[in-house]
C-alpha cells in the first residue's frame, strides 16, 4: 500500500513520500521469515511453558496464571475448518493437552485423503475444538528425526534449541480470506519454527536444511488443512493442490519467494527515499543505481513517475549539487534524464576543478558545521551576480538561496561564534603571484551557511545595491530601521533586522566604512560593488584585487567556484552583543500571525478545529506556535455571529448508531439544498452534497435545476471520480425521500451499478443528520463569507466550494485527522489560499490597446479544481476567470473595515503566506485609483452604503415660535474619518427595478422640530410644520457673511443668514473635514428648514392661501410661496372648487363597515383615500353606477362550446398558490412560421409577399456573409451542443410591409456556447420619455433611423453551426456561423458592443453613465433600441452629420428626418407620437390597438355602453378554490397571458392610469376564475373604449431656466392579500408625466405612515437616476421635488426625534429616507389627497374621482 501511494498521488511532497515508505519496517537480513511485528501478530515468543511441578488430569485442571497456558478438556464441537477459531486461535482454559500437539495425528492412524475432503478424525472430546487422540501417542516432533540425526546447521540447531522446551505451542490463526493468505503464511511458518520444524522450511535459495519425515509431513498436512480452509485459499495455492494435495512444501516455497520479492520492493523504495549524493562517487554509478531501482519498481507494478523520482533524487543532493534543489524545484515537467544531465555537468566541472587545483582540499569541518536552523519564512533566494567572466570559465549566477526555505536541519543560532581552522588557499589566477604572499583564511566568527560558500569571506556582488551580512559581530552603530525595503532578484522582500556601518581595515592601513544591512535570511554575506565604488574602491578582476582609483592595492580577491570573494579579516569587529543586535528589529518571519487573520483565512472555522489541524499537520506551511492564540478564547467574529446565527445546537448522535462498518468511500450520504431565489440564470440555484461515512470527505456540485437528468449526471460524475481516484466502489448511498432521489431513472441507475439506496423513513430527519449538518455548516460558512466579503449573492456557490476545500482539510477533534488525511491526500498548503473575497489585480493578457491598463480589479474566490490557478471574480467583465496572473491588492481587506476588528491589518501576514505566489506586479508598481465608480451592470444600480452610523447629537432642541429663550448649547458630532475602500459590487434586489447609481452624500445633522402632530395618510388634522421641507443642507461652499440678506438668488453655491455665530463641526461626506454650521437661534432654526434651497428663489411672504400651505409663523420668515409654487406649478393636478372652512366630522364615522373578505381584496377595499367622496354626498350618481356594467360571459361561451365528451379529470387551483406562482407575463407570439406563411397559406397575395420577403432576407444574409459558404459540414462531425436550430419567422408590420427574418433558436441554445455574463442592452423607456420631454421644451429636431440587419454587422466569437435554409435542400449538412444571427443569446450583446464602439470612436459620442444605450455629445443625443435610433438635436445639420457617418459603415434608413415645422407623426418603439416643435407632443397607440384588440377574440361592447373607468371600488376576488378541467384551465391561462400581456404593453408605454388594475390582474394569471376573466374583459373593454386617448404634453414655460423633476407618491395601506399595501409613484419632468409605477409592497406594513414611507423610499432611487440623466442631457440646473399626502411622513422626514421610530425596521427605513432626502437635495411638499394623481396607482376609484385625477394628462 505504501508503494502504491507514490504512483497514485504524484503530488505528495518529499516528506509525505518518505513517511509513506519508511513507515513500513523492512529488515535486510537473509532470513526471509524474520518479519516485522507490525505485520505479524505478537505470539508468545517463549511459547507456553508448562510447569514441570504441575500435574493435570482430563477431569480437572488448575487454571494457569498465564492465559497462554492450556489444559486438555473433552470437546464436542465440530472441527475448526467448519468455523472460525475464537480469540486469535488461543486455546481456552482447561483445553491444554499434556502430550503437546500429538492429536494432530500419526501416519498409522490418519490416512492421506484428498484435500477437498474432511479428514477422518477420532471422535472429538465434548468441549474440544480439535479431535482427541490417545495420550500415549507422542508428538512426532518430540524426538529428532532418524533421517536428520544431528546434521542440522547452526541456525536450525538454534531454532531447535530455542523450541526444544516448548511443550505447548500457540497455533496460527484461522485463514478467513484469500487476501490474508500472505500474512497467514508468515504466522504459519512461525508456528512451524516454534514446533521444531524450522529445518524443513525452504531457505533463501529455495532448499530446506534437511529432509522432511513422514510424521512431519503428516503433521504439516493436517495443520495446514485445519487452519487454512480450502474456500479461503488463493487460486495459485489451489492450482498446486489440484496436482498434489500433499505438496505443502511447494506452497511454502512459493510463499517465501513472494515474501522476498515484497522485501526487495520495500528495500528499493526505502533506498530511493533515502538517496544521498555529494559527488564522492562517479555520477555514472549514481545514475545506474537510481535507474535500476526505478526500473525494478516499474517492472513490479510500482510506477514511479518523473516528478516523484526527481523530488526524491533532489532531496538527497548535497554539496555543490544542492543548489539543483532550488533551481529545479519549480520545473513541473522535469524528467530524470534532464536532472542527471545537470548532475553530470556539475560532476565533470568538479573533476576539472580538482585537477586544476591539486593542492586545495576543502576543510571537512565546513560540512560538519553546515547544520543550521533558521526561522520559518517563505522568502526566496537572493541572486548575486559577478561583474566579469574569466577567460576559461563561465560566469554563473551565484547559487545563493534563502536558507530559511532550504535548510531545515537543526543548528546553532545565526550569530553564534565558532572557530574554524585556517587553511592555505591557492589562487586560481596567475596575477595573484604579484602580491608576493600566500593567502590564508583568517579565523572567522561565522558558521558556514551553504555548501558552496567560501567560509570567512564576503561574496562580491555587482548586481546588489546594498551590502547584506548575517553576522552581528561586524556591524557598528546598529539601529532599527524596519522601513527599509530590500528585495531579491525575483523582487521578493527580504526582512531586515537592523542597519549599521561595516568598517574595513585594509592591508595598507586604509580605513573606510560603508552601510550594511543585517538579516539572517540570506545564504551568503554579500558585499555590494556599488557601495564600494561610492567610497572610491573598485574590483579589478584581471589582477583579482580590490584597489583604489590611484592603483593602490587594498585586498586580494579569491575566486572560489564561479564566484569572487574577499576575506572578512579586513572587517573590524564591533563591541555590540549578539542579543542586542538581534533585538534591534524583530524579523517579520518571527512575528506571530494574529488569530483573527487565520480565522478569516480558514473560512471562519472555530479555534479548536484550527488548532487540531495545525497539530496534526493537515494545514501545512506553518505550525501552531506561529499563531497568536491569546485572543482566540474571547474573540467574537461579527461575521460569524451574523452568518452562523442559529436557534440551538443540533442533536448529537442522531445518525444510526448500529450501522455496519464500511471501507472508505463505500458508504455515502447525500442531500440537495435549494433553491436560492432571485439569482441570474447563469448562477446555480441548488447544490448537491456528498459525504463519505468513513473519512467524512465532502464533495459539492452545483445544480441549476432538480431534473432527473441533472441529478443523474452528478451521480455518474462522483462514482467515476471515486472509482478512478480512490480505487473504491460505492456500495450504499443514503438519501432522503425527495422525488429527485426516488425517481425511476435514478433507481435504475443505482441498481445497474450494484449500489444499494438507503432511504430515510417517513418523518425521521435524525436518520439523515450527516448530510443535513453538512449543508447547514456550508450554508453558515456561505452566509459568513458573503457577509464578510460583500460579494454579490450570485457567487454563493463559490463560497460553498471555498468552505468545502477548507473543511476537508480541517482535523476532526474525534479522529485527530482531517478528511484529506483519512483519504490519503496531502494536507492543504495555506500559502496557496487567499481569504474569500480578497481584492486582487488580475493581469489582462489581451488588452484593447497598448495603452490600455493591464490590470483588472477582481475578488479571489477559491482555488481552481482544474489547474494550479485561482478562481477570481471580475466585476467589470461580469465573469470569473481561472488564472495565476494576479497580485494581492495591498491595504484592502474587502469589508473588514465595517466592523471593529481592533484596527487589525493583515497585509503583512498575507504577504508572508503568499510571498511565493506574488506573480507579476511588484508592490511598488501598484497604483491605487481614487475613482471607484464602476459602470453599472443594470439600468439602475448603486452601491448603497450599509455602514452603521455613529450616534448623532442633536444640534439644538427647537422650541415653539413664541418662545424667547436663548439658544441652547450646541454639542459636537463625533468626527468621522473617511476611508476609501474598494467595495465589492452589491446585488440589486430583483424585486426593485430602480435603484440609485450615484454616490449619495451622508446626512448632516438637522435641527429638531417640536410640537408636531402626527396624522394618518390624507390627514384630517391641522399640522403646524413646514409643508415644504428641503433637507439639503449644503456641505460645501458654506460661509458666514456680515450682511443679513433675506433673498435667495439662484446659484450653484448659495449664501445664508450667518453672522456672529459659533461654528460647530458636523459630519461631512466624501472625506471633507472641518465643515461647520453656525449656531442659530430657535427662530432661525425654523426658518432654515424652509430656506435651505440651493436653486429656488424666495421672496417675502404676502399671503398663505396658495395651495392650502400652512407655513411656520416667524417674524422674519422668507416666503415659501414661490418655492412651493415652483414645485407644484404646471403639474397636471385637478382643479378643485374652493371650499369654505368647515369642521370635518370624525374620520372614522363615515367609513363603510369592515368586510371580512377585505384582506383578500385585489381590486378594491376600504381605505381613507375614498373618505372624501362620501362626506358631502351619500348617493352615488348614475355615472358612478356605470362601472357595474359587466361583460356577458354567455356571448363568449357560445363561441367556444365544445362537443359532449366523456368526463375529464379536473384540477383544483388555490388562489394564494396561483398568485404566488406568477413570475412574469409571457409575451404573445405575433409572428408566423414558414409553414403558416408560405406552405399552407391560402391567401395567394399574402403568400407571394411573404415569398418575396423570404428571398430578400436570404440575399441579405448572403450579402452580409452570415455563414461560411466555402464548406458544408456533416452533422456527425460536429459536437451536437454547438449546433443551433434555426427557422424563418414572418410578420406583417404596421405600415403594411411583409417581413421575413432568419433566426436561431436561442431558447434551446446550450449554455456552453455563449457567455451568460454578456447583456443585450436597449434604451430604457424612462430614458426615451425623458429625451422626448426635453426635446419638446428645447425645440429639438427629432430624427428616426433604422439600421437594416443590424445584428449581422457583429462578428461571432464562438464556434457555432446551423442548418442551411430550407431552399438549399441540405438537411443533413451544417454551415458555420460567422455573424451574430438574430435569436442567439450573444447576438444582442455583440451588436451592442459593435455599435457602441462605433458611436464612441467614429461619431464622437459618449454613453451616459448608468443609462445604457443613451449617447450624447455637445449637440446630439441618441437613444438606441437594437436597430432603431432616435436622434435629438437643436441643429438639424448635427443630426445629418451623424447620419452620414453611420452610412459609411451600416445600411442606414431615414424613417423620419423631422425637419418640418408642422405636426410630424412618428412611430417610435410602438408609440404613435404627434409632435409640433415648440408647441406640444401627443403620445398614443390608437392605430395599434385598433388592429390588435379585435384579434384577441374578446367580446367588445356587448350592451352597447361604454365603460368610464377600468374597475370599481369595493369589489373583491373570491378566494374559493377553482375547479377546472385540465385542458380548459390551460386554455384560460393562455388567454389571460395574451390579454394581460397586451394591457401591460400599453400601460407601461403611456397609460399609467391603468397600472394598478394591470398589476393586480397580472397576479391572478394562474387563477382564471370567471370573476377574474370578467375583470380582465372589463379592462380590455376600457382600453378599447379609450384607445383614442393620448398622453398630452405641452411645452413648459418656466419662470427660471431650470428643469423641475417631481415624483408624486401614494400608498394604500393593507388592501392586498396577506395585508400587503399597494404603492404607486408618478414621475413628472417640467410638468409632463414621463412614467409611473404601481406594485405591491414587498413587506407587510404596520401602519399607513409606514406604507407611505415605503412608497417614498421606493421612488427616491429612480428620481435620483432621472436627475442624473436630465443633467447629462441638459446642463440647466435641476430642482427635485417629492410630493405626498401624508403629513405624518413629512414630520418624520424633517424631524430628528428618533423616538418616533416604533421598531428597528421602521426606524431604519425612515432614517434611510431622511438621509436620501437630505443628501439628494429633495424638496418634500404636501399635496392634498384630492389632488394626488398618484391615487390612481394604488386603489380602484369611482368614475368621478378617476376622471378628476386623470383628465389633465390623459385625454
From Swiss-Prot:
- Binding sites annotated in the UniProt record for Mg(2+) 2: 1346, 1427-1428
* Keyword hit for Cell wall biogenesis/degradation: no
The record's section on CDD domains has: RNase_HI_RT_Ty1
Q: Which residues fall in a compositionally biased region of kind Low complexity?
A: 153-165, 402-418, 960-969
Integrase-type zinc finger-like: region residues: 583-640
- Report the residues modified as Phosphoserine: 416
Where found in the cell? Cytoplasm; Nucleus
Identify the residues that the record assigns to the RNase H Ty1/copia-type domain, covering every copy. 1610-1752
Q: Where is the composition biased (Polar residues)?
A: 1-10, 48-60, 127-152, 1005-1015, 1054-1082, 1101-1111
Q: Where is the composition biased (Basic and acidic residues)?
A: 1038-1053
The miscellaneous annotation reads: Retrotransposons are mobile genetic entities that are able to replicate via an RNA intermediate and a reverse transcription step. In contrast to retroviruses, retrotransposons are non-infectious, lack an envelope and remain intracellular. Ty1 retrotransposons belong to the copia elements (pseudoviridae).
- Self-association and partners: The capsid protein forms a homotrimer, from which the VLPs are assembled. The protease is a homodimer, whose active site consists of two apposed aspartic acid residues.
Please state what the protein is called: Transposon Ty1-MR2 Gag-Pol polyprotein
From which organism does this entry originate?
Answer: Saccharomyces cerevisiae (strain ATCC 204508 / S288c)
**What gene is this protein translated from?**
TY1B-MR2
